[in-house]
């Protein structure tokens, strides 16, 4: 006969699941890097990302000590630009020959842009960074809410016209970012494109057979496009998941909602 006995709470029991711990310090881990095999806690994930971004800044960012350098950082209130601005301030913000300005474009999307704009403002206040903004109306474009309302009429008048809001918003937003960079006489523009963004863009261009567009991808350190300030992408080798984890670890102000018109 098999003997059964009751296990009380006072008796030690073997854990059914062992939470992963950091390879470096033994604390609770937040990520396993599939590409490196490392398991890291929030603190050592931050150190890993900081090291990679610092290496990219040394490659992409050319600082002119004689006249100083103005870096314009395009932010949106989201995780990518929040991490980008935080790391740029951390890595080069103390230099006397560097001026950092952050800017955000208001697309005119009710219920989405106001809270994300506030996150951008809060982040800049926390970091002590100058903040500027512009809107589609200031650029003499329609607000995106109005653009979306008119899309059915546009498609009726022109069969070849795009009915995707992102097609219009992308063009307007790029012009807004360029206008902000020009406003502060920026020497360089920093964009928050991560590894996932870069890979997606390359694959889409390959699928469309658009090799020229792939060749024009940032960074443009040595060959600025259309006379604009060089564009740098310090986060281009950082996976989106790690950026999100770092933003949460540092409790950065960020807006989690997706654009209601995203497709």
Language-model-derived ranges and their functions:
Residues 247, 261-263:
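RNase H-like two-metal-ion nuclease catalytic core shared by retroviral integrases
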Residues 217-255:
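Metal-dependent de-N-acetylase/amidase catalytic core
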Residues 134, 252-261:
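Conserved S-adenosyl-L-methionine
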Residues 2-216, 220, 240-242, 249:
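ATP-dependent adenylation/nucleotidyltransferase module used to activate substrates
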